[in-house]
């Protein structure tokens, strides 16, 4: 299936019925759909990824007024060698952000934080990475509420449920897209239209063109 097939046969939805469309992509959530798209290859690490440029191509089929992408980046560690894992992750995350901007997304980004994690007895058990954009996405949706008729949300995070309910009370339509096994029941029930993303895997696969392209991340996130 290519984009023309998608437009002709699997149409996401008819944009004429949804007025002015704003798209909000929670890319940290969307990126993990790769584990559902290609479970064998991504059992432990991300060996297959979602292509941000192809993602933009699919989104553009519904002729959005604006499209936003939210994604955190690792900090550069100038005191460490360039081939250190942290610097590799930094370059990979910046590469994705640059690609999103070149693909027409308005990008919201910030540093990924590492937080000490302790067990119930107060024993240090490691560090966890944290970088969610719930507040930023909510603020963008609320501040721009008069500029759109429909929110097209790319996420399965149940944390958006209350926000989307509020938007519906303001006569906004909600379209949510997510892999079936990543989608929360709350988002399914409050959406005017829920679209399973699973049939899009072939359209969204990232295929490096040459060796100069940053390698696929071996993160076990």
Which positions does each model-derived feature cover?
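Nuclease catalytic cores that cleave nucleic-acid phosphodiester bonds
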Residues: 94-221
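Domain-level signal for Mg2+-assisted phosphodiester chemistry and nucleotide/NA-binding surfaces
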Residues: 2-128, 173, 178, 182
């Amino acid at each position: 299936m290519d984009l023309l097939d998608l437009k002709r046969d699997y149409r996401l939805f008819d944009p004429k019925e949804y007025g002015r469309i704003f798209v909000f992509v929670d890319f940290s959530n969307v990126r993990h759909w790769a584990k559902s798209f290609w479970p064998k290859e991504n059992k432990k690490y991300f060996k297959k990824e979602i292509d941000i440029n192809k993602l933009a191509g699919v989104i553009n089929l519904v002729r959005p007024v604006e499209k936003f992408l939210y994604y955190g980046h690792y900090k550069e560690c100038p005191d460490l060698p360039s081939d250190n894992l942290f610097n590799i992750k930094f370059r990979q995350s910046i590469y994705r952000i640059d690609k999103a901007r070149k693909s027409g997304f308005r990008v919201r980004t910030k540093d990924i934080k590492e937080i000490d994690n302790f067990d119930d007895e107060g024993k240090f058990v490691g560090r966890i990475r944290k970088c969610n954009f719930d507040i930023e996405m909510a603020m963008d949706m609320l501040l721009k509420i008069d500029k759109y008729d429909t929110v097209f949300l790319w996420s399965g995070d149940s944390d958006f449920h209350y926000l989307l309910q509020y938007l519906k009370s303001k006569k906004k339509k909600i379209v949510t897209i997510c892999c079936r096994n990543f989608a929360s029941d709350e988002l399914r029930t409050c959406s005017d239209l829920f679209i399973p993303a699973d049939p899009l895997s072939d359209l969204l696969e990232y295929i490096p063109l040459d060796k100069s392209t940053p390698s696929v991340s071996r993160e076990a996130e």
